[in-house]
């Protein structure tokens, strides 16, 4: 996600690393590259132009704070401006009826299922319904998603029009004291008057708390132009951007708030029901600048591991008692947190510096099979594993002695790295990488990426 933009921003800002002061020459070169990066990312032309203008006004001729280098001052300014054009603060979803509008093929119906799942996990009472009479398959799809998530799907007798279905769905949601009614609407391959009139009538009878436009990140400015039409007729309150995980550019995300004046509420980051995230402008800005996203990483960890369990794991790491049973537990935890490449992108400095690493997620199964073939005593004390034991473990796991040796060697290297981390109080210095945070779980995750890389 946003890899291309991150790479180009890093390259542009790198030129200021050794600068003793900000001059017209060096800042012009940096800003020129940033401007080109934005335009290549399909950011709206006026948005890119204004962005560069604001940065120039804030850094050229200004005194650099004593606690910052010239490069840090520029990066700080760029970060603040990125947060601003991305929307400033996270925009919460207002309770009530939420209308989802947009064209066909953007993932609107699937997005409703994902958001229903997210809201339910947050402890909210959620219901869904559909007014998309033109695509019966969409109604069936939403019904199945609702069953999977475990929220009610409001279905009504045949013969009702879209507007009447919407009215009855709202009435039922109020009777059942639902926090959020997520209402799907008909889409089109392109905007037409019939669609807009129907949506306006649905808006009138439902009095929605939110009207969210669902846009495909890959469509860039095309999606933005269509969103303008919807906004003019309906008064959008927010945007959901789907397929962000496949968007290396990010032009749509960087243009929405400035062009439409409404915030991005959610982003879709994968195909699974869990692959939806609230949109945090500051976190996206950090990712664009290669500063990682520790907040999201911690939140993902908290979903799969309790604080007590994390403390036990951290204590084992610090005391050198981390064994192969703990490694197996960590592997399972990391798998539950999501794809390795996504987690890697959240660690500050790691993604751009270690992008040459290839992480094969099939390694998980192989490593776990090897560890499972060991006896409890061998897992707790790998030093007793001699050649005879290695042959038995290899046979039992369907691997080779070489695979077993590789696992044991990397395990010992990982333990050594962890001990160094604890003594140093954080990630040891790696050229051109920022110092890593002092959280054992994050350091362990980083080492696990190295452990699994091929």
Curated annotation (Swiss-Prot):
Primary location class: cytoplasm
Binding-site positions, GTP: 102-109, 184-188, 242-245
One annotated Gene Ontology cellular component of this protein: signal recognition particle
PROSITE patterns on file: SRP54
Catalyzed reactions per annotation: GTP + H2O = GDP + phosphate + H(+)
GO biological-process terms attached to the record: SRP-dependent cotranslational protein targeting to membrane
A family per Pfam: SRP_SPB
Listed EC numbers: 3.6.5.4
SUPFAM superfamilies: P-loop containing nucleoside triphosphate hydrolases, Signal peptide-binding domain
Record-linked Gene3D superfamilies: P-loop containing nucleotide triphosphate hydrolases, Signal recognition particle SRP54, nucleotide-binding domain, Signal recognition particle, SRP54 subunit, M-domain
Protein name per its UniProtKB record: Signal recognition particle protein
């Amino acid at each position: 996600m946003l890899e291309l933009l991150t790479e180009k921003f890093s390259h542009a800002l790198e030129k200021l690393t050794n600068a003793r002061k900000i001059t017209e020459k060096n800042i012009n070169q940096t800003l020129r590259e940033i401007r080109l990066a934005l335009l290549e990312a399909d950011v709206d032309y006026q948005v890119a132009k204004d962005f560069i203008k604001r940065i120039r006004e804030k850094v050229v001729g200004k005194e650099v704070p004593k606690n910052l280098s010239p490069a840090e001052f520029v990066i700080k300014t760029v970060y603040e401006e990125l947060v601003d054009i991305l929307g400033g603060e996270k925009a919460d979803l207002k309770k009530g009826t939420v209308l989802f509008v947009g064209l066909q093929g953007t993932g609107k119906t699937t997005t409703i299922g994902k958001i229903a799942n997210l809201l339910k996990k947050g402890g909210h009472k959620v219901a869904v319904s559909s007014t998309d009479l033109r695509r019966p398959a969409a109604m069936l799809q939403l019904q199945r998603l609702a069953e999977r998530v475990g929220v009610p799907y409001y279905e009504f007798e045949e013969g009702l029009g879209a507007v009447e279905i919407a009215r009855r769905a709202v009435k039922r949601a109020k009777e059942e004291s639902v926090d959020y009614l997520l209402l799907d609407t008909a889409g089109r391959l392109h905007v037409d008057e019939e669609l807009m009139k129907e949506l306006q009538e649905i808006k009138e009878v439902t009095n929605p708390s939110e009207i969210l436009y669902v846009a495909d990140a890959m469509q860039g400015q095309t999606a933005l132009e269509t969103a303008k039409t919807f906004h003019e007729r309906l008064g959008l309150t927010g945007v959901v951007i789907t397929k962000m995980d496949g968007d290396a550019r990010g032009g749509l995300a960087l243009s929405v708030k400035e062009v439409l004046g409404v915030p991005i509420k959610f982003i879709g980051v994968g195909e699974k029901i869990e692959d939806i995230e609230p949109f945090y402008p500051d976190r996206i800005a950090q990712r664009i600048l290669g500063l990682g996203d520790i907040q999201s990483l911690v939140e993902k960890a908290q979903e799969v591991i309790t604080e007590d369990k994390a403390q036990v794991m951290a204590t084992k790491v610090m005391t050198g008692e981390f064994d192969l049973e703990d490694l197996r537990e960590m592997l399972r935890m990391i798998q539950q947190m999501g794809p390795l490449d996504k987690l890697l992108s959240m660690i500050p400095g790691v993604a751009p510096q270690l992008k040459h690493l290839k992480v094969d997620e099939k390694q998980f199964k192989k490593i776990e099979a090897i560890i499972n073939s060991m006896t409890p005593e061998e897992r707790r004390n790998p030093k007793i594993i001699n050649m005879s034991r290695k042959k038995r473990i290899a046979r039992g796991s369907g691997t080779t002695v070489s695979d077993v040796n590789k696992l044991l060697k990397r395990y010992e290297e990982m333990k050594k790295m962890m001990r160094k981390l604890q003594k140093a109080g954080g990630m040891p210095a790696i050229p051109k990488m920022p110092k890593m945070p002092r959280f054992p779980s994050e350091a362990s995750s980083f080492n696990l990426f190295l452990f699994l890389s091929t």
